[in-house]
């Protein structure tokens, strides 16, 4: 099949790569325009655009796609069989959805209709979901409201964070999308619609994964310890707090259970009721901080202008004192 691939971040590359290596022909890639992201106002290409350039594939980076007559006519002229969309970043209008022969399909990283929207992986971790997955969806004009052709569910591991879970789902999306393309090609002249599953028939709650905002990254020590842990995983590696006026990225923590607190090595912890207080500094354990509920151990962090540090090294770097306060 002749395919146009739509994608922008690194997450999308596994799917683009698997189709380039398949029997199908990727005749073009659509990605977001270059953006100014570094000092000196230098324009930076999206990861997908950079990858497509290495593969010598024609690239389109329209500033707008809705009512863009020139771009739409260009797409129509390519006689494309299938549009594959994975983390492109914009909702495609009806006039584009209707162009390809086999339709326009999206791989969404959640168990729809849970976590429709821009940041499903982040919110599945932040909210402590036990499972997630990938759904291959026939796109319509709504926000991730299309019918599903395929879906695969995976367990979210206790040690998963945004990086590790994104990698798993990126690989799963690629494999599932390739399988979906074969199904569409084989059954196109049969009743493809009969193979689709409507989201409202799955009995799942509809939730929305809004875009992550700058304010979301700040750790609120007044929350429950488990919620703080989930947030750090879901926003890895950008969750942060303020220590002595400097930004401190919190990369990994451990929640101390009630039983663990009874261990003799923690008995000398200062008793502070205020969240965000350093309760103890234990060389072989880490920095212990109070929350609304259980204390947490700061295992890995990155102080502004410094390298990532853990446990003993982090203690030597920060030189924290019992009773100091981490601000939110």
Curated annotation (Swiss-Prot):
Its EC number is 2.1.2.9. One of its GO terms (cellular component) is cytosol. Keywords: Protein biosynthesis, Transferase. It comes from the Bacteria. Belongs to the Fmt family. This is Methionyl-tRNA formyltransferase. The gene is fmt. InterPro entries: Fmt, Formyl_trans_C, Formyl_transf_N, Formyl_transf_N_sf, Formyl_transferase-like_C_sf, Met-tRNA-FMT_N. It catalyses: L-methionyl-tRNA(fMet) + (6R)-10-formyltetrahydrofolate = N-formyl-L-methionyl-tRNA(fMet) + (6S)-5,6,7,8-tetrahydrofolate + H(+). Disulfide bonds: none annotated. It comes from Prochlorococcus marinus (strain AS9601). CDD domains: FMT_core_Met-tRNA-FMT_N. PANTHER family: METHIONYL-TRNA FORMYLTRANSFERASE (PTHR11138), METHIONYL-TRNA FORMYLTRANSFERASE, MITOCHONDRIAL (PTHR11138:SF5). Attaches a formyl group to the free amino group of methionyl-tRNA(fMet). The formyl group appears to play a dual role in the initiator identity of N-formylmethionyl-tRNA by promoting its recognition by IF2 and preventing the misappropriation of this tRNA by the elongation apparatus. (6S)-5,6,7,8-tetrahydrofolate binds at residues 110-113. The keyword Lyase does not apply. It is an enzyme of class 2 (transferase). GO terms for molecular function: methionyl-tRNA formyltransferase activity.
């Amino acid at each position: 099949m002749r395919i146009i691939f739509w994608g922008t971040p690194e997450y999308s590359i596994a799917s683009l790569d698997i189709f380039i290596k398949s029997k199908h022909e990727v005749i073009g890639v659509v990605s977001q325009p270059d953006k100014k992201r570094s000092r000196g106002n230098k324009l930076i290409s999206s990861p997908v655009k950079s990858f497509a350039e290495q593969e010598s594939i024609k690239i389109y980076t329209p500033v707008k796609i809705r009512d863009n007559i020139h771009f739409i006519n260009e797409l129509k002229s390519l006689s494309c069989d299938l549009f594959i969309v994975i983390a492109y970043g914009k909702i495609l209008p009806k006039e584009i959805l209707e162009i390809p022969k086999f339709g326009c399909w999206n791989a969404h990283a959640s168990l729809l209709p849970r976590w429709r929207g821009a940041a499903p992986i982040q919110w599945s971790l932040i909210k402590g979901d036990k499972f997630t997955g990938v759904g291959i969806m026939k796109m319509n004009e709504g926000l991730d409201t299309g019918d599903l052709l395929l879906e695969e569910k995976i367990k979210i591991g206790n040690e998963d964070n945004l990086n590790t879970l994104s990698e798993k789902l990126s690989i799963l999306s690629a494999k599932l999308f390739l399988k979906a393309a074969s199904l569409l090609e084989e059954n196109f002249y049969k009743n493809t619609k009969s193979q689709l599953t409507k989201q409202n028939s799955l009995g799942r709650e509809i939730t929305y994964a809004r875009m992550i905002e700058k304010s979301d990254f700040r750790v609120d020590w007044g929350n429950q310890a488990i919620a703080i842990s989930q947030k750090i995983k879901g926003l890895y590696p950008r969750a942060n707090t303020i220590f002595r006026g400097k930004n401190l990225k919190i990369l990994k923590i451990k929640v101390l259970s009630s039983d663990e607190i009874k261990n003799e090595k923690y008995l000398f912890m200062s008793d502070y009721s205020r969240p965000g207080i350093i309760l103890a500094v234990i060389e072989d354990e880490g920095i212990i901080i109070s929350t609304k509920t259980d204390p947490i151990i700061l295992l890995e962090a990155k102080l502004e202008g410094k390298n990532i540090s853990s446990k003993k090294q982090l203690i030597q770097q920060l030189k924290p004192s019992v009773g100091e306060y981490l601000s939110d």
